[in-house]
Curated annotation (Swiss-Prot):
Residues 1-19 form the signal peptide. This chain was isolated from an IgA myeloma protein that binds phosphorylcholine. GO terms for cellular component: extracellular region; immunoglobulin complex. InterPro entries: Ig-like_dom, Ig-like_dom_sf, Ig-like_fold, Ig_sub, Ig_V-set, IgHV. It holds the Pfam family V-set. This is Ig heavy chain V region M167. It comes from the Eukaryota. Residues 20-133 form the Ig-like domain. Keywords: Adaptive immunity, Immunity, Immunoglobulin, Signal. One of its GO terms (molecular function) is antigen binding. GO terms for biological process: immunoglobulin mediated immune response. It comes from Mus musculus.
Amino acid sequence: MKMWLNWVFLLTLLHGIQCEVKVVESGGGLVQPGGSLRLSCATSGFTFSDFYMEWVRQTPGKRLEWIAASRSKAHDYRTEYSASVKGRFIVSRDTSQSVLYLQMNALRAEDTATYYCTRDADYGNSYFGYFDVWGAGTTVTVSS
């Protein structure tokens, strides 16, 4: 009986490791005003197409700002932007690789921030629920 329980525990543990939900951002760096960067967010452990995915940034003054969203497949991956980045930033997905992107153009000093990829916890059924999965972020510095 004890051996059987050990196997159940091991299989449960391995399943948990295999199914860990996570997002990992990359692509930040130093860029001059007017320049461009593309951020990436590699995701794993969940069905990427089923969820709204968002980009949020935190400025050096520690203010959090939602900036862009890509809705779920059920909502045709429609995109939304904050007024501060609309027309300059483009959010997109590679569903085959489960990667979210943020193309950032015409960068300004005020775009300096740590950028976070987040998953909307509401499973694509309502817009702007709460964000249950966050990455460690990637830092963008816009300076000459």
